[in-house]
Amino acid sequence: MNMSKTTISVKLKIIDLSSEKKEFLDNYFNEYAKATTFCQLRIRRLLRNTHWLGKKEKSSKKWIFESGICDLCGENKELVNEDRNSGEPAKICKRCYNGRYGNQMIRKLFVSTKKREVQENMDIRRVAKLNNTHYHRIPEEAFDMIKAADTAEKRRKKNVEYDKKRQMEFIEMFNDEKKRAARPKKPNERETRYVHISKLESPSKGYTLNGIKRKIDGMGKKIERAEKGLSRKKIFGYQGNRIKLDSNWVRFDLAESEITIPSLFKEMKLRITGPTNVHSKSGQIYFAEWFERINKQPNNYCYLIRKTSSNGKYEYYLQYTYEAEVEANKEYAGCLGVDIGCSKLAAAVYYDSKNKKAQKPIEIFTNPIKKIKMRREKLIKLLSRVKVRHRRRKLMQLSKTEPIIDYTCHKTARKIVEMANTAKAFISMENLETGIKQKQQARETKKQKFYRNMFLFRKLSKLIEYKALLKGIKIVYVKPDYTSQTCSSCGADKEKTERPSQAIFRCLNPTCRYYQRDINADFNAAVNIAKKALNNTEVVTTLL
């Protein structure tokens, strides 16, 4: 056995809040959000007239700066920025830039002290009433928001450039015969399909001329929408649903199941409930061990969280995270392949490494979420009408769908991890996080969008990953290519297999034991995923 570190999160719910306490907590969250949004807007205004002078090399991906005389310090250094705030543009070095626009210097512009005054239009204390420590932390939150927004904008711009490049390829294919190559016709195909000459080796089945024309129109609309969104002024309002606290601010009274946060709420007592009964002996031992681990952490902090509950009201939580060492297994008898789908929530199949075959435990998890979301769609259509009886009751029904989805995903993930632990197997899944969005078509029907929203890959896979790592079980992500089109028994490709429906897979290879037999498509895909992980082929990432 070898030890491995993993992050564990424990959430305590604050319960039995009076109306006064709720109002007090709610006001503090709103004040925190107001101050953060104010700070973000002022920082953006300050940095608006600064221009980055670095150029990135394509090969090394490193920033290159021209050397010159800094207009502030007068030394010959690398010039990183051009400051246009004080009339004439001034080219400045990294040290001078940090001295004027670094995080620490900008923070001083917002927070006044006994020895330092700030301008009235920059003073956070005039905007919101908060704890003194939070006044100093709010500029950090604002910088994080700006950084996240800029990263998202860069990603959107990159996607627009990629879409424009793809659109140009389709235009070339449509207008110039030399730029397109014909794919060999299949028996059932009426029209010839083409691919761009630069993509002859790609597995794409190609596009008909009408299909190419539709692609050009669809991608044009997509690019237009994206550019319109990029041209708008971006003002990001901070929701203020998470506040960072130092752990020593929180005082626990386990005998009464209460906490106090004197730095924020003076002597206000807040009743809590946790993942186990605080009053029981096992609960006391659990929390004693938990506090000991928390206090050993170098960065000792927690979060006060505000969430919207199923009835539309706010709920409050105290969340702690800490790193714990878990025993990682080195010896595995096989692999548990997990295929997450739409019609069925998931299929988990154990594949034995010695016998080279699928055997028990095998579990196909039904998807109750599909019915819940279909019912939700009907309710939304119903509520869109002008007059609906019992409107408030219907809205309450809508708000209760998310907790049911969360519970279903947690229950399924727990069962899958228990199966792997019992069978002494590691878990393998498809790596679909980036692939789903990239493969989306420019134009989707409402039905396609609806069924895509049924797919809970990210939510369920992250829960499986988290619960498995706590047990010391290895997670392997493999490429999703052809897992649902290849026969798990004989390895026949998509040309010798067929899918009569989404739930059924059929092999057409006469030598295969599944020849002309209808088998579960999710079972077949799960076995293929397990085989890829065991053979160490097309593995993307391995955790633990």
Swiss-Prot record:
Mg(2+) is required for dsDNA cleavage. Residues 196-326 are annotated as: Wedge domain (WED). Zn(2+) binds at C487, C490, C507, C512. Residues 486-520 are annotated as: Target nucleic acid-binding (TNB). Pfam families: Cas12f1-like_TNB. Its cofactor is Mg(2+); Zn(2+). It is an enzyme of class 3 (hydrolase). Keywords: DNA-binding, Endonuclease, Hydrolase, Metal-binding, Nuclease, RNA-binding, Zinc. Residues 335-485 are annotated as: RuvC-I. InterPro entries: Cas12f1-like_TNB, RNA-guided_DNA_endo/Transpos. One of its GO terms (molecular function) is DNA binding. It comes from the Archaea. The active site is at D339, E430, D522. Residues 521-541 are annotated as: RuvC-II. Residues 1-195 are annotated as: Recognition domain (REC). Its EC number is 3.1.-.-. Residues 327-334 are annotated as: Linker. Has an asymmetric bilobed structure, with a recognition (REC) lobe and nuclease (NUC) lobe; the sgRNA:target DNA is bound between the 2 lobes. The REC lobe (residues 1-312) is formed by the WED, ZF and REC domains, while the NUC lobe (residues 321-529) is formed by the RuvC and TNB domains. Has a split RuvC-like domain with the nuclease active sites. An asymmetric homodimer. Guide RNA is probably required for dimerization. Part of a type V-F CRISPR-Cas system. CRISPR (clustered regularly interspaced short palindromic repeat), is an adaptive immune system that provides protection against mobile genetic elements (viruses, transposable elements and conjugative plasmids). CRISPR clusters contain sequences complementary to antecedent mobile elements and target invading nucleic acids. CRISPR clusters are transcribed and processed into CRISPR RNA (crRNA), which requires a trans-encoded small RNA (tracrRNA), but not this protein (in vitro). Belongs to the CRISPR-associated endonuclease Cas12f family. This is CRISPR-associated endodeoxyribonuclease Cas12f2. The lineage of its organism: Archaea, Candidatus Micrarchaeota.
